[in-house]
Amino acid sequence: MDRSGIEARYAEALEAFVRKVRDDEQVIAAILLGSLSYDKVWEKSDIDMKLIVHDQKLTRSFMCFTENGIAINAGIQTRDEFKRWVEKSASASFEHSYLLRGKILFTKDPSLEAVFATIRHVGERDRQHRLLQLGCFALGGLAKAEKWLYVKEDALYSAFWMIKLIDTLAQIEVVRHGEVPMREAVQQASALNPAFFRDVYEGLVGGSVDPAKARAALDRIVRFMEERELELFRPVLDYLKQEQDVRSLSEMADKLGTVVRLDAATLEPACGWLAERGHLAPFPAEAKATPKSRVRLEEPAYMLEDADGNVR
């Protein structure tokens, strides 16, 4: 079947399915998601959508339907659940990008249009915390790529880890520019920073890898992180500046993890990086495994350090 025939088949299936669910008195709205809402479909594509229903106790939050031989994957939420989901979808997150390209097919409740419209806004606080999260993820991947090259002396597997890391670096670049990273984040970032992504992405994916090439790519990635460190890890620095005291990783994770998912293990590479770069001073902090534990342990803690090496 040619391209036009495939697209017509999917359009017919969508129209038929929407016509049915619109007649269901329990369904308030239908939102088209995924490739059919913004991209091309092919014979192996499915249709993604979200059905918003009246408040009730649902036995399933997801169903796979079929129409004209095409699978329709539908997330099912009550009106209140949908509103909470939108509110919790932090700006620049995957959920945010997924919603951003969605399209309301119909709604029987005009207030849902206003809820959906809020998705277009990218909050500065969300953006900063998303950069922090991505920066932490990037440092974790970078450490693995460095280990495979410098410790295990395997340039090819080091390149494999760098290729996995490229998507995170691309998301960083996209979010830095006030945009929302999509599934095609590498293509978005390549338009914003062509030199870096040409050298690292195309260089690793498009050719053979040797130790010298892997080392050069790692050096470029390290510089990429160094040039952006104050922007990526700004929430950590701002928090410690405000506290003016030593704070443990657990305390920082509790404070900074309210917007995006951040636990102490995720945050540790960022604080370690900032300490190595002279921005933070490390201290051990007393800790216990459980509130009832009697054995005293230690966890990493940090305090802000000024340009002269003085803690403050």
Question: Where are each of the predicted segments found?
Answer:
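Helical scaffold of the NTase/Pol beta-like nucleotidyltransferase catalytic core
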Residues: 1-28, 269, 304-312
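Conserved NTP/Mg2+-binding pocket subregion across the NTase superfamily
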Residues: 2-6, 12, 67-154
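Generic non-transmembrane alpha-helix signal with a bias for helix starts/N-cap capping motifs
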Residues: 14-15, 58, 264-267
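Alpha-helix boundary recognition
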Residues: 22, 99-100, 275
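Conserved nucleotidyltransferase catalytic core and NTase-mimicking acidic/glycine-rich helix/loop elements
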Residues: 126-286, 290-293, 297-298, 302-312
